Structure formats: C-alpha cells, structure tokens
Amino acid sequence: MFVPLLGFEGSRPRLVHSELDASLVAPIVGLPGFRMEFPAVAVACNQSYLDEVNGYGQLRYARSSCPFDVYSTLAQITRDLDADHLQVAPLGTKPQALGAFLFALRREDIAEIVYDHPIRRANRTEGIGTTHLYNVSDFVDAW
C-alpha cells in the first residue's frame, strides 16, 4: 500500500508511485493546514493523480503541524485496511515527515519510507514561519 503525504507538487506522488508495486493508495492531506487554504490547494494540485489512482476513497487527513497526528493516522490506516506493508512518501510538511519517520521506526516490520530527490527551484519560498517544538523523546519512551 502506498501512502503519500500530499504537498503542492502534484507530479511527485505520481513519480514516486511509478517506482513502486502498490495497487492501493491511501493519501494523507494536512488538515488543518498552516494556512486555511492549503488543504484545498494540496488536493487541487494532486487532483489528476488522485483521479488516476482512485485516491479519494481512502483519502485521510492529519494536522499539517503535528507529527503525532500523522503517526496516529498511519496506525489507523494500518488497522482499517489490514495493511501488512506500507510505503510512506513524506511529500507534505516537515512535521508530517517527522510523524512518518516515527511510524516507520516504530513499525519497521511493515513500514518503509520512500522518497524522491526533487531539484529545488530558485526563488521558491521566502522567510521563516513559526518554529514548532515537539517532545519526541517522551513519545518514543511511551512505546
């Protein structure tokens, strides 16, 4: 099963998925997003991919700013779909990527991280947003 955490670059999940042998796709969109319009933008940017893989039926949501919510969403996907192998592509936010990595570390028996290596465009983003701090140690110690 392929689980892409969707961002704004609609070609990336398709490219990663093309390298895999996954028939079922359960995409995750950040909701709420860092800005109100971001979830709708992410879905719009990935619309052709979601149509192509029938991804709307298994579409899930996890807060863009919370790695622990992504972790819980991945655990829920595993339970709901009785998944024995997840290929997770952290293509969304950095906190979502952290949640994906925590899940893969905890569930290394079924989860793996798959990632592309995009070429960064010039003048893409400016400035620095809010800094988020996460107590990962307590989360890991609770395992």
Language-model features and meaning:
Residues 46-54, 131-143:
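A polyampholytic, Gly/Pro-enriched intrinsically disordered region
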Residues 5-77:
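Redox- and metal-dependent alpha/beta enzyme cores, enriched for Fe-S-associated oxidoreductases
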Residues 4-14, 33-34, 89-98, 120-121:
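Gly/Ser/Thr-rich loops at beta-strand to alpha-helix junctions
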Residues 83-91, 114:
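Short beta-strand-loop elements within alpha/beta enzyme cores
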Residues 58-61, 77-78, 84-85, 103, ...:
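Extended, well-folded catalytic/binding cores that form a central cleft or groove in large enzyme
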Residues 96-107:
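Short Gly/Thr/Asp-enriched flexible loops that form oxyanion-binding sites at enzyme active sites
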Residues 108-140:
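Short, flexible loop segments at boundaries between secondary-structure elements
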